[in-house]
């Protein structure tokens, strides 16, 4: 092997990959175009005195894996606080549904408004749990030998009642699935809001998986990193440094030299050349293989990657600093611990998604909030709070451009908050929008797409980003891919990073 292994991109997947390589004794250098590591797991003072996550505000998938334990991230400072209830539906008509880690507590909460709906939700979870348990080994990156016995048992449980109906449910859009299983928008709306959080629209075939995924929050919970999502990044950098690895920020890549189909070097903008025979990219795979790779990936592998889909629907954020928590009528202690959903109707979410796909601002604005300062006082001045507002169906490219439309986004978000929490405007100390343009330019995500590519049945698991590239290897000798656009999926998981590192290490020991 020539030179260090170069990891391109210091998001959490790139850092996870680097840690596993360094743990195996490899010399590793991570190069990052931004001035600090973290990617989607960054926390910054976007309003003076108030620290906000720039994208990921709650972590769950990584806590379903062995990655934190295998890298001893707790020993490097990783500290998670559970968010329970993980979600509260704040309906405009005053009804509340609290989704706790405990299914029984959740059923009791739903029963306060509708005993029939509560039992329907229980049946939906009975259906969802074995399906989630079946797909979990792939999400965790378990080996086939370890996973197969559990997968067979869970699949049998999932299919024991009417297997054809289960197959139909699995390939359905979650709009259809939720209408079959849940009787009203009391629970359909908030469950759909969580499914939309994955970046999947209500009418996308196969999107049902992300409504079934509601069961995963009951199984594993939802977690806030103390001090924000940056806590995970800091722990990974600490562990990597302790293992002898190196992170270089403000080091954008000009190209990856691979003459004759073999990696030779990573060349930084400015001309510095890092000689290497091994590279893992942890950025958008289309950027890595079609723009940075020199020569670009060709043949059917390149054509398939170029055809991978990226829709016009992404996420937009509004950070709001306040001097108190949102004053929801009929609130109870704990209502600010997790996600607070303002999606009242499944139809509204579908309408908003359609408008955003067409480049229009969504109307009505689908919105949810996190108030992490309710759990973590380090994020705001004493007695003050951080309110993180997220629209899961914002247009990447909007009619008129985001510079001209950002104020409309802010006004729509604040108006929604005022309706749900009367008097909210009077508590505001500062506002900072974070549009798809900002995520593109300051976050390094083309089009503001944190998942890099759409989440869809044909772009998930071993088909992500494409079938030919779904095992983290490329046709270029020494070049591997990782990140949200690779197998198995996006989100704060770390699995793509670990699996890419394992692929490289396995190939080098052959």
Language-model-detected regions and their locations in the chain:
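N-terminal glycine-rich phosphate/pyrophosphate-binding loop and immediately adjacent elements
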Residues: 3-140
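A conserved FAD-binding loop/helix module that cradles the flavin
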Residues: 56, 484-505
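Rossmann-like flavin
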Residues: 92-205
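Flavin-binding catalytic cores
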Residues: 114, 325-326, 359-364, 402-441
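Helix-loop-beta segment of a Rossmann-like dinucleotide-binding subdomain
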Residues: 152-165, 201-235
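A glycine-rich dinucleotide-binding beta-alpha-beta segment and adjacent secondary-structure elements
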Residues: 184-198, 362-370, 423-487
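Helical element adjacent to the flavin cofactor pocket in flavoenzyme catalytic cores
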Residues: 213-263
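Mid-domain catalytic core of redox enzymes
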Residues: 252-380
């Amino acid at each position: 092997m020539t030179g260090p292994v170069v990891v391109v991109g210091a998001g959490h997947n790139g850092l996870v990959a680097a840690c596993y390589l360094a743990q195996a004794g490899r010399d590793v250098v991570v190069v990052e175009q931004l001035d600090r590591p973290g990617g989607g797991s960054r926390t910054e003072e976007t309003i003076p005195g108030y620290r906000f996550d720039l994208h990921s505000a709650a972590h769950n998938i990584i806590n379903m894996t062995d990655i934190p334990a295998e890298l001893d991230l707790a020993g490097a400072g990783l500290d998670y606080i559970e968010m329970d209830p993980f979600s509260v539906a704040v309906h405009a008509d005053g009804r509340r549904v609290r989704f706790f880690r405990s299914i029984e507590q959740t059923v009791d909460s739903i029963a306060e408004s509708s005993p029939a709906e509560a039992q329907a939700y229980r049946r939906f979870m009975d259906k969802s749990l074995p399906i989630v348990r079946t797909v979990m080994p792939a999400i965790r990156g378990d080996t086939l030998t370890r996973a197969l016995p559990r997968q067979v048992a869970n699949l049998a449980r999932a299919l024991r009642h009417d297997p054809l109906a289960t197959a139909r449910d699995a390939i359905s859009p979650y709009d259809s699935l939720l209408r079959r299983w849940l009787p009203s928008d009391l629970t359909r709306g908030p469950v759909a809001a969580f499914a939309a959080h994955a970046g999947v629209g209500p009418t996308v075939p196969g999107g049902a998986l992300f409504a079934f995924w509601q069961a995963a929050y009951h199984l594993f919970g939802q977690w806030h990193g103390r001090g924000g999502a940056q806590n995970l990044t800091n722990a990974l950098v600490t562990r990597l440094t302790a293992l002898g690895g190196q992170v270089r920020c403000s080091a954008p890549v000009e190209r990856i030299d691979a003459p004759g189909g073999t990696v030779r070097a990573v060349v930084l903008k400015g001309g510095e050349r890092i000689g290497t025979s091994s590279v893992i990219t942890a950025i958008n795979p289309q950027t890595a293989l079609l723009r940075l790779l020199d020569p670009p990936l060709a043949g059917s592998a390149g054509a398939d990657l170029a055809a991978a889909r990226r829709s016009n629907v992404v996420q937009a954020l509004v950070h709001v600093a306040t001097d108190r928590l949102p004053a929801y009528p009929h609130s109870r202690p704990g209502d600010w611990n997790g996600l607070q959903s303002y999606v009242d109707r499944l139809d509204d979410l579908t309408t908003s998604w359609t408008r955003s796909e067409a480049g229009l601002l969504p109307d009505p604005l689908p919105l949810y909030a996190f108030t992490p300062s309710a759990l973590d006082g380090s994020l705001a001045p004493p007695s003050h709070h951080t309110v993180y507002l997220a629209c899961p169906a914002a247009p990447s490219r909007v009619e008129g451009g985001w510079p001209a439309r950002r104020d409309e986004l802010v006004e729509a978000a604040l108006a929604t908050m005022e309706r749900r929490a009367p008097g909210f405007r009077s508590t505001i100390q500062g506002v900072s929008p974070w549009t798809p343009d900002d995520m593109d330019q300051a976050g390094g995500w083309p089009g503001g797409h944190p998942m890099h590519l759409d989440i869809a049945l044909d772009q998930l698991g071993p088909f992500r980003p494409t079938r030919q590239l779904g095992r983290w290897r490329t046709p270029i000798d020494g070049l591997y891919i990782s990140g949200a656009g690779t197998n198995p999926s996006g989100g704060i998981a770390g699995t793509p990073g670990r699996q890419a590192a394992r692929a490289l290490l396995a190939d080098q020991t052959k």
